[in-house]
């Protein structure tokens, strides 16, 4: 996924062409993927795992919010923060309010994304990631700052709406798809799942205009290719609470995936076997390659046992604690 430091490489490459300013327009384009405000509209607005989804996605569509105490008030920073560069996010604004339980509130104007935070939640200082809901504007704004850092003066960015005739001056390549998949599976990155899912739908000729239509196309493909007759998808990440999948469907999908792509298990995490007390079983020779899934009241594990057993097999374990869920809701 695109990060600020990778975007800085593009700004540096632009500078190396000898361009120092442009007199026309600075346009950005989503590559044909219309922006989606958030994956699941029923989730709280401030959750970073429920970001917007578009063709331009920067820093997992998150902005870093940092606050420090300054006497009786607070100083705020909103940055497209990365390891090397920390450009200010000019398209996002934060204010504080004296109010009760609701920690964050969000609103938009034509120019800005406006957040407010309850002062009682701030303490002495701290920082956290917040989602951005206009990822194209955010990405272009960060690039505008990075270009200025490398001596290229650009006008304020504008949404191109549709791609126009153009000539490529420079580019950067993404990581290989296999690396992107490994990162997605390791860190459970919903945005990556949605981006790859929509891209796959477009590549196969389906309707990718919304997450729901794209997910329906994926569902139809999964029924045909992965033997998942009971699967119901409303997005590509599984975040929406209307999504349904059985353990049987998951096992069928794992078996079919290995046939379609024999190297698929190596994308998964290697998990060491444990005994009935939860301790690592050092005597076991089993090789478990699997994906974990954990929420407040749900725990899941699905993958393969490929070595150390008489017959390799796929498995899926889904568990939930309904009493805990009831307490949370």
Residue ranges and their predicted role:
Residues 1-57, 61, 200-249:
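Mid-domain, small-residue-enriched loop/turn segments at the edges of structured enzyme/sensor domains
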Residues 19, 27-84, 242-284:
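A conserved catalytic-loop motif detector
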Residues 92-264:
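A small/polar active-site loop signature that marks catalytic segments
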């Amino acid at each position: 996924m695109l990060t600020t430091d990778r975007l800085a490489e593009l700004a540096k490459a632009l500078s190396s062409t000898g361009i120092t300013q442009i007199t026309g327009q600075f346009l950005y384009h989503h590559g044909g993927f219309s922006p989606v405000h958030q994956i699941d509209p029923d989730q709280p607005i401030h959750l970073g795992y429920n970001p917007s989804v578009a063709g331009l996605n920067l820093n997992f569509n998150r902005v870093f919010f940092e606050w420090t105490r300054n006497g009786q008030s607070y100083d705020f920073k909103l940055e497209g923060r990365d390891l090397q560069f920390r450009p200010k996010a000019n398209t996002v604004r934060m204010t504080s309010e004296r109010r009760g339980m609701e920690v964050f509130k969000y609103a938009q104007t034509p120019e800005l994304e406006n957040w407010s935070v309850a002062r009682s939640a701030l303490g002495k200082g701290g920082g956290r990631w917040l989602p951005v809901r206009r990822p194209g504007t955010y990405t272009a704004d960060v690039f505008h700052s990075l270009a200025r850092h490398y001596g290229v003066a650009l006008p304020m960015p504008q949404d191109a709406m549709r791609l126009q005739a153009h000539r490529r001056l420079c580019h950067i390549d993404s990581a290989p798809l296999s690396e992107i998949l490994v990162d997605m599976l390791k860190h459970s990155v919903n945005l990556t799942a949605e981006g790859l899912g929509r891209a796959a739908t477009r590549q196969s000729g389906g309707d990718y205009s919304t997450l729901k239509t794209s997910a329906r196309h994926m569902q139809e493909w999964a029924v045909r290719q992965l033997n998942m007759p009971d699967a119901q998808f409303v997005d590509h990440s599984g975040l929406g609470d209307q999504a349904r999948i059985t353990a049987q469907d998951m096992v069928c999908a794992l078996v079919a995936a290995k046939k379609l792509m024999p190297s698929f298990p190596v994308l998964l995490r290697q998990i060491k076997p444990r005994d009935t007390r939860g301790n690592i079983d050092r005597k076991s020779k089993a090789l478990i390659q699997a994906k974990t899934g954990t929420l407040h009241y749900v725990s899941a594990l699905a993958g393969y046992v490929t070595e150390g057993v008489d017959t390799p097999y796929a498995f899926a374990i889904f568990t939930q604690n309904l009493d805990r869920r009831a307490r949370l809701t």
